[in-house]
Amino acid sequence: MEASTDAVHAPTVAGISGNATVGAYSVALSGGYPDDVDLGEAFTYTGSGGRDLKGTKQNPKNLRTAPQTSDQTFENSLNAALKRSAETKKPVRVIRGFKLQSPYAPTEGYRYDGLYTVEKAWMGTGLTNGLLVCRYAFKRVRGQDPLPVRDLERERMEMEEE
């Protein structure tokens, strides 16, 4: 929510902000898709859509955790925004969230981690369900401060000691 009110990343739930005409303004890496790979200076990001968000009163769906039940497409406006960014190479703001399983994720909340370019956009098969997903390769723009890095092994050991 703070990223939205601070105008760093407008959507409060969606991981992609932008449109098909100008491209993406920002993305949030928050652990929503198991196919995402975060290497810090570069990462692979999974697109939007393909999730059943209807739910019922007895079994409500969560926007972030609903399972993917259909293929993603580049017709989805958010996926089209990232595809456009791959074409223009206009930098995109990146926010990392604490739920992301990565040494580059903050320990709490969300953090602005700088500008990245979308180097490539393609369709691929999801790792967990065999459905098609939109994939994007991001690369960090040079000349920015180094990313903070967590020691996940030390954090695990400290949690076990408690």
Which residue stretches match the model-derived regions?
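Acidic, glycine-rich low-complexity segments with interspersed aromatic residues
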Residues: 1-111
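Compact mixed alphabeta submodule
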Residues: 104-161
